[in-house]
């Protein structure tokens, strides 16, 4: 269910010998369904019946419920609808503005420009460029990707 998936990582941290009560699990689920605007009939809905974008939000919520200081998101918006993609990007920006460190991995340059304050370009497992501030532009990103080093 959506509830079980949302609390999974927090339950692992807490320990399976100290399970959340049904009331606690419902409270967490309701809070994160609202926070992430997960479109579901209820917290009891099987996760497989949700859209891909809402499944992605549940997975993101699973980790946010652990209150991490650092979040690594690898292509979190790949294959989901445009509306949900924008919602996730806004959430990432909000988390960063609240002090969370976020590594956002994406192959979409437009998305990188919307979500990143600093961008690292990798090729063959090596860093080939770092862009920030005025350097963050479509042309600079494409030049760095194509092989023009910025270091």
What does each of the following model-derived ranges do?
Residues 1-151:
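Glycine-rich phosphate-binding loops of nucleotide-dependent enzymes
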């Amino acid at each position: 269910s959506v509830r079980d998936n949302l609390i999974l990582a927090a339950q692992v941290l807490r320990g399976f010998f100290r399970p959340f009560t049904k009331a606690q699990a419902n409270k967490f689920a309701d809070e994160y369904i609202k926070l992430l605007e997960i479109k579901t009939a209820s917290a009891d809905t099987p996760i497989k019946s949700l859209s891909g974008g809402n499944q992605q939000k549940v997975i993101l919520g699973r980790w946010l419920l652990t209150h991490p200081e650092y979040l690594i998101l690898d292509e979190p918006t790949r294959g989901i609808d445009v509306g949900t993609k924008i919602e996730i990007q806004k959430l990432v920006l909000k988390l960063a503005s609240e002090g969370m460190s976020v590594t956002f991995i994406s192959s979409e340059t437009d998305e990188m420009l919307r979500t990143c304050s600093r961008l690292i370009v990798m090729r063959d497992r090596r860093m080939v460029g770092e862009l920030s501030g005025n350097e963050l532009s479509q042309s600079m990103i494409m030049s760095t990707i194509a092989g023009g080093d910025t270091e």
